[in-house]
Amino acid sequence: MVLKVRDLDRSLAFYRDLLGFRVASEMSNVMIFLTATGENHHDLGLLRVGDSAPSPIPTAVGLYHVAIQLADWDAVKRAHAILSEHGLLRGSADHGVSRSLYTADPDGNEIELYCDAPRDEWEGRVDTVMTVRPLALD
């Protein structure tokens, strides 16, 4: 996935310093490729389009949000602490099949950070358990 961003440095600080992505390569201040695991060249590309680029229109077709799967529940709790510390936590939810946090990157792209719920809690019952409930973080 490649996201268009206004400011590469600001976006890099968010994805690298807060979300833990690593720089895989850069293209002369135009594009940065980031990896989450190091197992492939990149999981996310950031393409600079400039400070005057308009924001996406919420009611237009296009990307709703980016969902990034974290390793486990402990990783979600760590992400909650980091986002809360920086005032970037927009919401959280227990979806029955997953546990999710919501934030936005510097350009307003909504980001969901989640881990799957244990399979035995939902397998074969997704249509009855998939919901939006408050997320208990204790």
PLM features per residue range, with description:
Residues V5-D9, V66-E110, C115-E121, L135-D138:
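Vicinal oxygen chelate
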Residues P56, W122-R125:
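A short, polar/proline- and glycine-enriched secondary-structure boundary/capping micro-motif
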Residues L3-R48:
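Core segments of cupin and vicinal oxygen chelate
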Residues L47-D51, D116:
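Acetyl-CoA-dependent GNAT
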Residues D51-I57:
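Short beta-strand/turn micro-motifs at beta-sheet edges
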Residues V126-D138:
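Short, solvent-exposed cationic patches
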Residues M27, I57-A60:
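Short glycine/proline-enriched turns and hinge-like loops at secondary-structure junctions
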Residues V61-H65:
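Short, solvent-exposed beta-strand edge segments and adjacent coil->beta transition regions
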